[in-house]
UniProtKB/Swiss-Prot annotation:
Coiled coil: none annotated. One of its GO terms (biological process) is methanogenesis. This is Methyl-coenzyme M reductase operon protein D. Signal peptide: none annotated. InterPro entries: Me_CoM_Rdtase_D. It comes from the Archaea. Keywords: Methanogenesis.
Amino acid sequence: MIELEVFPHRYLKAETTENFLNSAYSFSTVERVVIHGESLPKKVGYGPAKGSPVNHSEKKEITVKGVPVELNLQVGRLWVLLKDESEIEKIDELCKELFPFGYRLTKGKFLRDTPTVSDFIKYGESAVENIDPKLLSATDPRSKFQNSVKMIPKSENSTE
């Protein structure tokens, strides 16, 4: 497995994120894409406006391969897991098309593939032993699972 980090030079708008995810998942070697960025909470957590709703223009629902995904963050980085190196150039071309303001594409190890102590504390030993390896590194142990992970099924009809 090959891991790529796509680091755009600006936060991405919801439409750009949606375009990137739909295009990336259309490639046959893309196994998973993890998005990371600044959280957009539902309510203001502190200050004079504490408790009032956050009405951010980029807090939207996007559709990735027909699956609705509530975007609760401003995407600042994407990690792409590939089966092999054959489509790295296609990912680079996609980034050139969608990110005219610039980006950095790095090949390396960004996602963990073995359970950590936090996983054992959060889920328990029996759950960690039976967990789907795709879920490792997909969520923060302090977060509520249903709110932080959205599984997008990989269809058999991928284009090259």
